Structure formats: C-alpha cells, structure tokens
Curated annotation (Swiss-Prot):
Job of this protein: Necessary for normal cell division and for the maintenance of normal septation.
Alphabetical list of Gene3D superfamilies matching this protein: P-loop containing nucleotide triphosphate hydrolases
Protein name: Probable GTP-binding protein EngB
Metal-binding found in the keyword field: yes
Keyword Nucleotide-binding part of the UniProt annotation: yes
Record keywords, A-Z: Cell cycle, Cell division, GTP-binding, Magnesium, Metal-binding, Nucleotide-binding, Septation
GO biological process, one term: division septum assembly
List of residues binding Mg(2+): 37, 59
Family: Belongs to the TRAFAC class TrmE-Era-EngA-EngB-Septin-like GTPase superfamily. EngB GTPase family.
GO cellular component, one term: cytosol
Stored Pfam families: MMR_HSR1 (PF01926)
Length: 211
C-alpha cells in the first residue's frame, strides 16, 4: 500500500463510546515499551506521528490512524506496566476487550513480542485473550536489530514455543530501525483489508514470513 494520507481520526478513552468506523481495521497489541508506536510510525512512513516514549505505559487510549481514507491502524494500550494501579489496568482491560468483541470492522490483531526475551506471563495471557475473542493473532517479533543475526532462529523458536504457536501461525521478525519485515507486514495487512481483486499479495512471500 502506498501511503498518501495519514490522520489520527479517533481517540477512545475508558469512558468513551466505541465508534462505528467506515473502514476495515487492523489492531496492534503488546506490552509497554515493546516498540508498538515505532512499528506504527514505520507502517505509516512517518517518523513520530504515533508518539513514542522511553516511559512505559504512555499509550492509554485506543488510537485510530486513518490510512488513505481506506483503513485504520488501531493502537491499543500497552499492558504489563507495573506503575499503573490495578484499577486503571482493569479499566484498560475492559476497554480492550470491549473493542475486540464489538468492533464490526476489525479484521486482524497483531501481537508484538520483544524478540530478545521469552514471552512473559502477560504476553501469554494477551495471546490467549485475543484467541478467546475470536482472532488468531499474527505475531510480530520486534527489536530485531538488537540481536545478532546468528541468534534470530533461536529467538524466533523461543517466541513460538513460549506462546504455543501452531506451525501455520504467522510470525514476522521486525525492526523499526532497519525496516526489516515492513514489506511483509504490509503484504499481510493488505490481504486483510483490501478487496480480493485488489490484493496482489505474493504467495511466495507469504510462505517466507511463516517460517
């Protein structure tokens, strides 16, 4: 997809009503500081449109980024941030669950996992939660540039094992710095949001990203 127009159309807080959007949506979930905003900026080809921060827990709303007046990239609040009160965490959880269950336009959920570490209990809980809400999430193993090339296969296997992924479940190693994995991500997103006649996803590339 060629990015011609980007706009933060909708911001949903814990007291807000979920919108009925006119375009298909793909959502991004992950623990605080996993690189979610950086990934979304890379997808939008913008340096800092989605606000990034070294402070975990910065995203506290559901943010809908309008792409070309044809789809939304949806940024969900990060989880696992220790300095947030249990009451606030519970509110965020209900907000995310409500979105996953009620959005009629949501086509797929991408779950971000830091490739340097085994999935945490919170990661596994979020994965199970997404599955229980009717989606088989695509896993994005972020911060690929932070490990050596020789470590990639081992760490990908650790993420797959830690989440209990099936052979056919898709995992994409990704770096917001080098943009490795960006093309594969967009090919997948296009396959979910574009009409079939417009979707020219290369089947060979699709096979590669499932390795």
């Amino acid at each position: 997809m060629v990015i011609k127009k980007v706009n933060l159309d909708i911001v949903v807080g814990v007291t807000s009503t979920l919108p009925e959007t006119p375009f298909p949506e793909v959502a991004f979930a992950g623990k605080s500081n996993v690189g979610k905003s950086s990934l979304i900026n890379a997808l939008m080809n913008r340096k800092s449109y989605a606000r990034t921060s070294s402070q975990p827990g910065k995203t506290q709303t559901i943010n809908f980024y309008n792409i070309n007046d044809s789809m939304y990239l949806v940024d969900l609040p990060g989880y696992g941030y220790a300095n947030v009160s249990p009451a606030v965490k519970a509110k965020w959880g209900k907000m995310i669950e409500k979105y996953l269950r009620k959005s009629s336009q949501l086509k797929q959920v991408f779950l971000l996992i830091d490739i340097r570490h085994d999935p945490s209990d919170n990661d596994r809980m979020m994965y199970d939660w997404i599955v229980n809400n009717g989606y088989r999430p695509v896993i994005v193993a972020t911060k690929l540039d932070k490990i050596k090339r020789s470590q990639i296969s081992k760490q990908v296997k650790a993420v797959r094992t830690g989440l209990g992924l099936r052979q056919e479940d898709i995992l994409i190693p990704f770096s917001s710095q080098t943009k490795q994995g960006l093309k594969e991500l967009w090919q997948l997103i296009d396959s979910y949001v574009l009409p079939q006649e417009e979707n020219e996803t290369d089947s060979e590339s699709a096979a590669i990203i499932q390795e």
